[in-house]
């Protein structure tokens, strides 16, 4: 269990400099690249100031964004993705403020299963919806059966071989429409890749 937010950070700009002599600029956005002159224009997101950096070699590594399927209701403020620490804090704040009683986790990979277990440990009634016939895709079905037993022992329900068709938002929560059935819930966590 993680008790301090700082325990989630593996590296800091200072530790990158100390260990690897790499100058990491957080809260900075590359807004232009001049390949002819080998420069990058950078905007400091805190001050708005722009400056130019020269480079010998340039590696583009913009990161990834969570997948948000194109389904009705996906933009509800009760629908969350988990990709980084700010996402984690947003989910935590929602739970503390709104006191949801139930959650649907869409996606049964490592992150989805871990999130489902944490939500269940926090007292929520949790269902995992997974398109495949088993959790944790790299596992074969027989190995995944042990994971299924463990998850069910935690009180987590499984909707395997099922997918989300639409989300309907209301003052009382969300209705998750599946290929087969519906689930009423207070929040949805997307963990589909």
Q: Where are the regions that the model predicts?
A:
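Glycine-rich, phosphate-binding/catalytic loops in enzymes
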Residues: 1, 75-79, 122, 145
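Alpha-helical scaffold elements within enzyme catalytic domains, especially in hydrolases
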Residues: 15-16, 118, 150
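A Rossmann-like FAD-binding core segment of flavoenzymes
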Residues: 25-46, 53, 121-193
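Short, conserved glycine- and acidic-residue-centered signature motifs
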Residues: 81-84, 112, 140, 144
């Amino acid at each position: 269990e993680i008790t301090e937010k700082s325990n989630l950070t593996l590296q800091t700009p200072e530790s990158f400099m100390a260990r690897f002599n790499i100058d990491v600029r957080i809260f900075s956005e590359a807004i232009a690249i001049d390949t002819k002159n080998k420069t990058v224009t950078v905007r400091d997101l805190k001050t708005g100031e722009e400056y130019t950096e020269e480079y010998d070699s340039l590696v583009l590594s913009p990161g990834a964004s969570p997948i948000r399927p194109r389904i009705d209701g996906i933009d509800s403020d009760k629908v969350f993705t988990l990709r980084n620490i700010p996402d984690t804090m947003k989910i935590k704040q929602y739970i503390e403020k709104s006191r949801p009683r139930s959650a649907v986790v869409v996606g049964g990979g490592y992150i989805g299963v871990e999130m489902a277990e944490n939500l269940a440990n926090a007292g929520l009634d949790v269902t995992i919806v997974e398109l495949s016939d088993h959790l944790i895709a790299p596992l074969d079905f027989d190995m995944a059966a042990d994971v299924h037993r463990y998850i069910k022992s935690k009180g987590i329900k499984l909707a395997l071989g099922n997918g989300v068709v639409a989300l309907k938002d209301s003052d009382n929560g969300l209705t998750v429409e599946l290929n087969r059935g519906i689930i009423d819930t207070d929040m949805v966590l997307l963990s589909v890749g």
